[in-house]
C-alpha cells in the first residue's frame, strides 16, 4: 500500500505529557486519542501500546519515548509520552523530543509531588515555552482538597517562572474519558481547546535567522572554499553576507554559490544538506565546529551554565563519580571541545545517574545561544548530555 502523503494544511505543534509517576500521563495520552478518534481526528491508541515505548538513541543516550499523533480542528499535534521518570529527564535535557508546549498532569488525589516539581523546573530550564495543567482523578478526590491543590500548583508554577495565575487548569478524569464517560470526554475536549489556544504556535525553523554548522570543508580550484553541512535554521541566498563563528575570531564572507546533491540552487533552507561556496575564505580558515550564520545573530562563547544528565553505569556511562574541575569533551553540533566543569556550592561530587546545574568553561569558543544541546564525552564515548541555560561571558 502506498504511504499517505503528509498534509500540511494545519500548523504543526510538538507537545508532551509531563508530571509525577502514576499521576496518569499515559492514561491521558490514550484518552486524548480515543476521544479525538470519535471525530476522525486520531487513531485510538491503547494504554499498553503507549506504555511499551520503543527505545531510541539521541546523542548517544538510550531513551524510551512513545510518539502519538492527532489533530484538532485548528492544529496537527505530535505528542510524546515517556514511560519512566529517567526517560523524561533525558528527553528534556537532550532535546530528543523538542516540545513546543507540555501538558502537566497532576493527580487531584495527591497534588504536586517531587517529580512534579522536577519536571516544572526542567521545563523552565530547557525553555519549554508554555504549560497547560490537567488535574486528573478529580472523580475520586475531595472537592475542598482540589481547591487547595489548584492554589498550590499556581504558586509552584509562579515560583519556577511560569505565569501561574494565567495557566489554564482543566479538571477531569483520564480513566473515565477512556471508558467513554460523557463528563470525562468533555474534560478532554476542554483540555484540547486550552492546548490549542494557550500553547503558542512555534516559529518554523525556516523563518529563524540562517545558521549552518560546518561538517566538512573542500576547496574548488579557481573558485574557492566550500563548507558543507545541514542547514539548521533559516534560508540562505546567493550573494548574501554571512559570518563564520566559533573556534577562532569571527570573520565575514559572502556566499557565491549553493550546491545540493551536485545541483546548483538559488536558495538553501532549513533541513537541506548543502555546500556553500564562500568568497575570500581559505581552506584553512574553515573547520568542523564552526558555524556559518546570518551576521550578528550568534556569538562565540566559552563560559556557560548548563543543566546536565550524567549517564548511569548500566547506560554505558562512567562507573565512578566526578568532582569539580572534571575535564571531559563537550560535543556541540559537529565537534568536541574540552571544557572544565565547576559544581554548584555544596555539591561535593556527581554520581552516575544524577542530573544537576553546572558551570562550564571551554578551551575554545563555540557559537551558542541559550537552549543549545550538547553531549558530554570521554574519548568518544558519551557519558552525559546537557542544555545551555545561561551564557556567562
Swiss-Prot record:
NCBIfam families: EF-Tu (TIGR00485), PRK00049.1 (NF000766), PRK12735.1 (NF009372), PRK12736.1 (NF009373), small_GTP (TIGR00231). Residues 81-84 are annotated as: G3. Monomer. Mg(2+) binds at residue 26. It comes from Chlorobium phaeovibrioides (strain DSM 265 / 1930) (Prosthecochloris vibrioformis (strain DSM 265)). Residues 10-203 form the tr-type G domain. GO terms for cellular component: cytosol. Residues 19-26 are annotated as: G1. GTP hydrolase that promotes the GTP-dependent binding of aminoacyl-tRNA to the A-site of ribosomes during protein biosynthesis. Residues 173-175 are annotated as: G5. Its EC number is 3.6.5.3. Residues 136-139 are annotated as: G4. InterPro entries: EF-Tu_GTP-bd, EF-Tu_GTPase, EFTu-like_2, EFTU_2, G_TR_CS, P-loop_NTPase, Small_GTP-bd, T_Tr_GTP-bd_dom. Residues 60-64 are annotated as: G2. It catalyses: GTP + H2O = GDP + phosphate + H(+). It is found in: Cytoplasm. This is Elongation factor Tu. It comes from the Bacteria. Keywords: Cytoplasm, Elongation factor, GTP-binding, Hydrolase, Magnesium, Metal-binding, Nucleotide-binding, Protein biosynthesis. The keyword Hydrolase applies. GTP binds at residues 19-26, 81-85, 136-139. SUPFAM superfamilies: EF-Tu/eEF-1alpha/eIF2-gamma C-terminal domain, P-loop containing nucleoside triphosphate hydrolases, Translation proteins. Belongs to the TRAFAC class translation factor GTPase superfamily. Classic translation factor GTPase family. EF-Tu/EF-1A subfamily. GO terms for molecular function: GTP binding; GTPase activity; translation elongation factor activity.
Amino acid at each position: 500500500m502506498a504511504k499517505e502523503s503528509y498534509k500540511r494544511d494545519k500548523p504543526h505543534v510538538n507537545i508532551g505529557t509531563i508530571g509525577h509517576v502514576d499521576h496518569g500521563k499515559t492514561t491521558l495520552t490514550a484518552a486524548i486519542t480515543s476521544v479525538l478518534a470519535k471525530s476522525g481526528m486520531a487513531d485510538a491508541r491503547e494504554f499498553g501500546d503507549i506504555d511499551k515505548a520503543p527505545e531510541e538513541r539521541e546523542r548517544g543516550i538510550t531513551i524510551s519515548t512513545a510518539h502519538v499523533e492527532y489533530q484538532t480542528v485548528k492544529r496537527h499535534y505530535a505528542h510524546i509520552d515517556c514511560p519512566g521518570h529517567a526517560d523524561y529527564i533525558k528527553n528534556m535535557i537532550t532535546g530528543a523530543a523538542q516540545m513546543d508546549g507540555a501538558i502537566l498532569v497532576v493527580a487531584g488525589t495527591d497534588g504536586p509531588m517531587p517529580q512534579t516539581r522536577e519536571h516544572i523546573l526542567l521545563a523552565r530550564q530547557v525553555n519549554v515555552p508554555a504549560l497547560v495543567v490537567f488535574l486528573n482523578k478529580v472523580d475520586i478526590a475531595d472537592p475542598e482538597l482540589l481547591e487547595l491543590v489548584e492554589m498550590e500548583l499556581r504558586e509552584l508554577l509562579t515560583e519556577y517562572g511560569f505565569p501561574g495565575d494565567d495557566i489554564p487548569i482543566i479538571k477531569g478524569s483520564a480513566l473515565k474519558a477512556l471508558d467513554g464517560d460523557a463528563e470525562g470526554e468533555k474534560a478532554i475536549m476542554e483540555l484540547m481547546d486550552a492546548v490549542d489556544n494557550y500553547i503558542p504556535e512555534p516559529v518554523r525553523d525556516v523563518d529563524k535567522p540562517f545558521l549552518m554548522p560546518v561538517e566538512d570543508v573542500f576547496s574548488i580550484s579557481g573558485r574557492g572554499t566550500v563548507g558543507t553541512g545541514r542547514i539548521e535554521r533559516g534560508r540562505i541566498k546567493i550573494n548574501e553576507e554571512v559570518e563564520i563563528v566559533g573556534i577562532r575570531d569571527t570573520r565575514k564572507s559572502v556566499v557565491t554559490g549553493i550546491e545540493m546533491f551536485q545541483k546548483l540552487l538559488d536558495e538553501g533552507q532549513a533541513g537541506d544538506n548543502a555546500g556553500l561556496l564562500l568568497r575570500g575564505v581559505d581552506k584553512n580558515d574553515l573547520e568542523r565546529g564552526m558555524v556559518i550564520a546570518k551576521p550578528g545573530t550568534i556569538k562565540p562563547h566559552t563560559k556557560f551554565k548548563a543543566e546536565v544528565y550524567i549517564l548511569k553505569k548500566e547506560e554505558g556511562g562512567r562507573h565512578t563519580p566526578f568532582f569539580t574541575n572534571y575535564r571531559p569533551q563537550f560535543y556541540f553540533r559537529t565537534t568536541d571541545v574540552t571544557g572544565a566543569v565547576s559544581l554548584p556550592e555544596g555539591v561535593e561530587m556527581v554520581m552516575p545517574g544524577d542530573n544537576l546545574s553546572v558551570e562550564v568553561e571551554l578551551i575554545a569558543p563555540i557559537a551558542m545561544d541559550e537552549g543549545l544541546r550538547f553531549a558530554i564525552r570521554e574519548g568518544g564515548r558519551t557519558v552525559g548530555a546537557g542544555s545551555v541555560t545561561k551564557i556567562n561571558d
